[in-house]
Structures are given as C-alpha cells and as structure tokens.
UniProtKB/Swiss-Prot annotation:
The keyword Oxidoreductase does not apply. SUPFAM superfamilies: P-loop containing nucleoside triphosphate hydrolases (SSF52540), Winged helix' DNA-binding domain (SSF46785). Residues 414-623 form the FtsK domain. Keywords: ATP-binding, Cell cycle, Cell division, Cell inner membrane, Cell membrane, Chromosome partition, DNA-binding, Membrane, Nucleotide-binding, Transmembrane, Transmembrane helix. It is a multi-pass membrane protein. Essential cell division protein that coordinates cell division and chromosome segregation. The N-terminus is involved in assembly of the cell-division machinery. The C-terminus functions as a DNA motor that moves dsDNA in an ATP-dependent manner towards the dif recombination site, which is located within the replication terminus region. Translocation stops specifically at Xer-dif sites, where FtsK interacts with the Xer recombinase, allowing activation of chromosome unlinking by recombination. FtsK orienting polar sequences (KOPS) guide the direction of DNA translocation. PANTHER family: DNA TRANSLOCASE FTSK, SPORULATION PROTEIN RELATED. This is DNA translocase FtsK 2. It is found in: Cell inner membrane. Pfam families: FtsK_4TM, FtsK_alpha, FtsK_gamma, FtsK_SpoIIIE. The chain crosses the membrane at residues 24-44, 74-94, 120-140, 170-190.
C-alpha cells in the first residue's frame, strides 16, 4: 500500500516544474527555433544551381552555399519540390518565432484558443492554401524563374497543381481560382478579416483627407488674416505719407553764356572803317540774341517733381526726385529709384508717364555719368530760342584752336556745345523731314566759315535737293560749284580719293604724319626763304614749289538720293575717304532723312564714328543711327542727340537756329572778299586738275597710252593755242585755257606723243613739228 501510494509522486510532470525552469526551457526552445529559421533562410538565400544537390550530380569542389553540402542538398530538395514558394516555410517559422517571443516577453502566457486543435487546423489549412496557390501561380505566371531553380517554377507540386487547373479552367480561370485560394489562405493563416482591413484603410484615408482639408482651411484663414493686417498697415502708411513734407527739390539754374572778346571788339566803332584785319565775317551779320527768359518757374518745377513721384507710384514704381535742371527747351529731373526698382521698369513706362503728364514725349536717361540716379527729360511749356550768334560769340567757340570747330547748340543746362570735326573725323547726321536737320547743317557750315579763311578750309557741297546748299554758290571756300547732279557728285568723291592719295604720297616723301606737319614744314621753309619743290612733278627738270594744303570738308545733304542714283561705287568711295582721309585733312559730313540699313550701311557706320540724330520716326531708325533708342522721343525743331566718338552715351543738344536771311548776309559778305578759285575738271570725271594722278584723278587713267590725251575735252583747244601761237609752252596753255600747271603739262606731253611737238630740249623748250597752213613743217622754239 505504501509503495503504491508513493509511485505517482515520483513522476516528472512538466506542468509541476518550477516556473523558472519552465521559462528557461521555453527560452531554449525559442533559441533553437530561431537558429533553425536562420539556417533555413541562409541555405535558401545562398542557393547556387552549380552546387551538388538531390536533383542533379555535380563534381564541384567549391560549394557556394553557406550551409555546405548538406545545406546545398537540402535547399535543392525544397526548391525542386516547391519552387520559389519554399520561402513560405520560412514565413511559417518566422510566425512561430514571433509567437514564442511574445510568450517570453509577457509575464503571462499568451492565451490560447479554447479549442487549440481547431485553431491549429485552421492555421495549417490556411498555410496549405497559401503554399498551393503560390506554387500554382508560380508555375503558370512566373516563367522567368526557370533559370534560377533546379526545375520548373513552382517545383514538382506547382507543375502538378498549375497544370491541372490550367487544363481544367484555362489560363485565366486557373489564375483567378489560385488568387482566391491565396486570399483565403492569408485570412486563415494570419487570422484577420479583409472587411475589417478595408474599414481600417478607409478610416485612415478619411483621417488623412480631413486633416489635409483642415490644414488647408487654417492656412487660408491665416493668409486672409495676414492680408487684412498688411492692408491695415498700408492704409496707416498711406495716411502717414500724406501728412509728411517732402524735401525740396534741388533746382540748378543754367549758367550764363560767357561771351568772347570778339563780341566786345566788334561792338566798338573802328577809327578807320576801310581797314580790315580779318577776312572772317562779322557776328553783326547774324541776328541779335534775344534776351533770356525764364522757361520754368521754381513752383512749376516743385509741382512737376511731386507729380512725377505720384504718377510713377500709381504704376507701382517708387522714386524720389532729387534735382531739376531747367534748360532752354527741356528740363531734366533726376530721380532716385527705391530699393529693388529696376531701371527697365521706368524705361517701359515712358509712354504711359508722358500720357499721364499730358506731354508729347518723355525721354528716360538710364545712366547719368558720375551719378547713381536716372533722368527724366520733359519738354518745357515755353521754348527758348537758341540762336547761332550766341554760340559763335561764346568763349568756348572762340577759344577753340581748331579751324574745323562746329557750333552745335546748347545742352540741357544751357551751355554752348561745340565739336571739332578734325577729331571726329567724320560725322553722320540723320533726321526726318522737319526735324531741323537742314538748319543744323547750315549752322555747321557757317561755323566753319566763321572760323577759317578760304586758304585754310575748302568745301565741296553736294545738294541733291538743289535748294538747301545752293545758297553758298560763289563763296571763296568752294573747290567747285555746288554739286546738284548726282553723277557729278560721284566724280567729286572720286577726285577727293585721288587728292587723298596724292597728299599721302607727299606726306610720306616729306616724312610727316599728317597735314598739320606738312603745312608746318612749308611754313618753316618759307620762314627761311626757301622753297620745297614737288617731288612728283611732271617736269622734274623744273619742278614747281609746294604750297600749304587746305583742309577739305565734303558735305552731302542727302546720302540716300546719292546712293540710289550712283549706287555701290559711292559707298566704296565714301568708305575709302572715311578710312584714310583723316591725316590727309579731308573730312565728311553725311546727312540723310532716311536712316535705313540700305543707306547707312555697315561699311559706312564702321568708319563714321560720330553720329548726330535729330528726331526720327521709330526706335529702329534710332538704333540704326545711334545703335540705341532715344531719338524717337526727341521734340523736333533742332532737338538732337550727339554721340561723340569713343563714347556710348549720347548728349542731348538743342540745335542753334539760323535763318535764310542770315545765311544770305554771310554769303554776300564772303562773295565780296573775292572770286572762288574752282578746280577745273573736278566734276568731269577723270579730268580733274591735280598732282600725282591716279584712277579717276588728274586724268591719269584717261591719259595712259599713246594718243589717249584726246579724251581730255580741252585737248583740241590746247592744240589750236599751240599752233596759233607757234610756241609750245606750258604757261601759254595754262594762261589761255585757265587751267592748272599739271594739266597743261600733261596736254603738252600728249601732243608730244601724237607727234605735234618735239621732246623737251636741254634749255626746256619744245619744237613744233606740225605743218603750217601751207603744208610745210616749221620748227620753232
């Protein structure tokens, strides 16, 4: 009895073990399960088809599987039977590891189901559905896995399941059934409801949407509040500005023009009126300068300054007017843009600002040299006249040492503006009809006539209109009559090119660099009572002496008409003169009322650096003449932009006005001083009188070859003079035909080639070989 009673107490029941030992055994089981799971995943992930396995034989010594040969063999079996779906076994192990971890970490055991057998059966059934559906889908759909598995995708079982379903239900039907099995298997294996999952996802999406909507509404509310706050601040700031007093605008009045001593000297009555110490015309020939009048009052300047600030502020541009410079025609307001305001904004508002200020135009000056502000040029209500007499009587004009000083007018501050044509050295003038271009050219010509005598400056005037420059006909400064025929204009330019080449040859021979150096050598020789002979004389035995050479100014009133009639040849001649003629003392003044690219070509623009733009019709014309806009905003009636050479900023100048009566009085005064000394043949093309010869100059081209002298229209008259007087003398032909020395010498040389006269003897005389009226040959000296 005693032995029977003690037997049950000696058995080892796990449930009766202490809790610590039970927990220790549970941890050992969990670690073993974790190790098995890791080893399982390792041999599957490191599977290599080349390793030896159950499904194939291999003699490879180096096994790449991390589980060695056993692991390679076991992985080959799993993948051969299940395919890639063998990884679902790893999921099963991981689920058990996760459940064991929960049991270890909890103080109490995880509650089990009331019917553990039913729960385990449902789990295994769900796993079987997942595994079967996965193998079937793999066999039907995932054909690309064939290269990585020992057999076909899905393994042996997948091939059986997928092939049977595809044969029975077709490709699509089998796929749908397998997807249904996979979905049900997931629900049974993980013990979750798809409906609950859908509800949770929907609740999460709804929460995100409501949160986003709430944040957007809050952001809109904050933006509305900020806008209301800014609006309140702007209203307060606007009311504060209205009561602020703006600083007064600095008004700079134009300085008085300083008159030269010449004006005061001419006002004095000379003791002997018949004695003249100068051939220059008197300033009294011009109209008197009217008294200066105030164009804009200080109150108007202050009011306009505030109006400019207000109008620009209406357009969203904050500026401050810091200074005003009233002039004879326009007033420049210097404005300082606020921080962040671009200059292009103000430039684009020029037309709108002019309309709001009820003005014809407003010119915006983006850059003022030496200042950090911009300029607005507004026309004055009352325009003050700028007379040429005021500019010619100024100290600036009379103190200029250059004999090619031209009076342009006054700048915006009322100061006289003069320019030296010798430094330009050529000038391009453009402007529409009525812009004051012709008056400006007359002012330039009169400036030259008031500065230099006829022996220092000579003119060639080309006037296609036959109205503008014909008034100067007969003055001593002209080299030829005023040219009105455009073909003769081409001959005149051709002569100028030949004269330029001749002067360069002379300067090169004498070792000087420009015309001033040449004339200085002539003066020094004259002071020593010596003469410098022409090194290129046609009579080398008796060369003629050289004289001082005058500067030549060629004025073309309408370049467009000249280009249209004569064509491309004129462009080449103008380009040659513009490129080389500066040192030779030849200068161009080109004017046109059509500043288009076919008139002012790139070749001409490249060699004429000085530009004067009167009012033009468009921005394109302004860019053509100035390479920038601005001339389209001028006021006309002599308002111009003067672009000096070497600068990119044009200066606004109000041109000096000179009437036709003033021009007539000056011209009559000059005519009374002497007859013009025209150069014969200058307009005849190829027969112009000169030295050195050349193509189209001095008849060099027409006289090349024996007997070619008959091309000279005076050749027959020269032969008659020689035969009639029975004497072959250069001075005789020169005196009777009133031509130059060189031309007469060439005519005698042509007679020598034709056999009319003999060659020059040792004493410089020629014999006449032509028969007399009786038919006998007479030889006379």
């Amino acid at each position: 009895m005693a032995r029977a009673s003690t037997t049950p107490t000696t058995r080892t029941d796990p449930a009766a073990l202490p809790s610590r030992i039970g927990r220790l055994l549970g941890e050992v089981r969990w670690f073993l399960l974790l190790a098995v799971t890791i080893a399982f995943l390792t041999i599957l992930l490191s599977y290599n088809k080349a390793d030896p396995g159950w499904s194939h034989a291999s003699q490879v010594d180096d096994v790449r599987n991390l589980g060695g040969r056993v692991g390679a063999w076991f992985a080959d079996v799993l993948l051969f039977v299940f395919g890639a779906s063998a990884y679902w076994w790893a999921l099963l192990l991981l689920r058990r590891v996760w459940r064991g971890w929960r049991e270890l970490m909890s103080d109490e055991r995880v509650p089990r189901a009331a019917t553990p057998r039913v729960d385990a059966g449902v789990t295994w059934f769900g796993f079987a559905l997942i595994l079967s559906a996965s193998m079937g889908l793999e066999a039907i759909r995932m054909h690309t896995l064939h290269m990585k598995l020992p057999r076909a995708p899905g393994g042996v079982l997948g091939d059986l399941i997928g092939g049977s379903l595809q044969h029975a239900l077709g490709f699509t039907g089998g796929t749908l059934l397998l997807l249904l099995m996979f979905t049900v298997g997931l629900s049974l294996f993980f013990h979750f409801s798809w409906l609950n999952l859908a509800e949770q996802i929907g609740a999460g999406v709804e929460t995100l949407f409501v949160g986003f909507k709430t944040r957007r509404e809050n952001k809109q509310d904050r933006a509305i509040g900020e806008a209301a706050k800014v609006e309140r601040e702007e209203v307060v700031e606007t009311r504060r500005v209205r009561i602020e007093e703006a600083p007064p605008v600095q008004i700079v009045r134009p300085a008085a023009v300083v008159k030269s001593e010449r004006v005061e000297r001419e006002k004095q009555q000379p003791l002997f009126v018949d004695i003249q110490d100068s051939d220059l015309p008197a300033l009294a020939l011009l109209d008197a300068v009217p008294p200066a009048q105030e164009t804009v009052s200080a109150e108007t300047l202050e009011f306009t300054s505030r109006l400019i600030e207000k109008k620009l502020k209406d357009f969203g541009v904050e500026v401050t007017v810091v200074a005003a410079y009233p002039g004879p025609v326009i007033t420049r307001y210097e404005i300082e843009p606020a921080t962040g305001v671009k200059g292009s904004q103000i430039v684009n508002l020029a037309k709108d600002l002019a309309r709001s200020l009820s003005l014809v135009s407003v010119r915006v000056v983006e850059t003022i040299p030496g200042k950090n502000c911009m300029g607005l040029e507004l026309p004055n209500p009352k325009r003050q006249a700028v007379r040429l007499a005021e500019i010619l009587g100024s100290q600036v004009y009379n103190e200029s040492a250059s004999q090619l000083t031209m009076a342009l007018g006054k700048d915006i501050a009322g100061k006289p503006v003069v320019a030296d044509l010798a430094k330009m050295p050529h000038c391009m003038v453009a402007g529409t009809t009525g812009s004051g271009k012709s008056v400006g050219i007359n002012a330039m010509i009169l400036s030259l006539l008031y500065k230099a005598r006829a022996d220092a400056v000579r003119l060639i005037l080309i006037d296609p209109k036959m109205l503008e420059l014909s008034i100067y006909e007969g003055i001593p400064h002209l080299l030829c009559p005023v040219v009105t025929d455009m073909r003769q204009a081409g001959h005149a330019l051709n002569w100028a090119v030949g004269e330029m080449e001749r002067r360069y040859k002379l300067m090169s021979k004498m070792g000087v660099r420009n015309l001033a150096g040449f004339n200085k050598k002539i003066e020094e020789a004259a002071a020593r009572e010596e003469k410098i002979h022409n090194p290129f004389s046609l009579t080398p035995d008796a060369p003629e002496p050289l004289d001082k050479l005058p500067m030549i100014v060629i004025v073309i009133d309408e370049l467009a008409d000249l280009m249209m009639v004569v064509g491309k040849k004129v462009e080449e001649l103008i380009a040659r003169i513009a490129q080389k003629a500066r040192a030779a003392g030849i200068h161009l003044v080109l004017a046109t009322q059509r500043p288009s690219v076919d008139v002012i070509t790139g070749l001409i623009k490249a060699n004429v650096p000085t530009r004067i733009a009167f009012q033009v019709s468009s921005k394109i014309d302004s860019r053509t003449i100035l390479d920038q806009q601005g001339a389209e905003a001028l006021l006309g009636m002599g308002d111009m932009l003067y672009l000096a050479p070497g600068t990119g900023l044009p200066v606004r100048v109000h041109g000096a006005f000179v009437s036709d009566d003033e021009v007539h009085r000056v011209v009559e005064n000059l005519k009374s001083q002497g007859e013009p000394n025209y150069i014969e043949g200058l307009l005849e093309g190829g027969t112009a009188d000169g030295e050195g010869g050349g193509d189209g100059f001095g008849g060099g081209a027409g006289l090349a070859g024996g007997g070619a002298g008959e091309a000279d229209p005076l050749y027959d008259q020269a032969v008659d003079v020689v035969l009639k007087n029975r004497r072959a003398s250069i001075s005789l032909v020169q005196r009777h035909l009133r031509i130059g020395y060189n031309r007469a010498a060439r005519l005698l040389e042509d007679m020598e080639k034709a056999g009319l006269v003999s060659a020059m003897s040792g004493n410089g005389n020629r014999e006449i070989l032509a028969p007399n009226r009786n038919g006998n040959v007479v030889e006379e000296e």
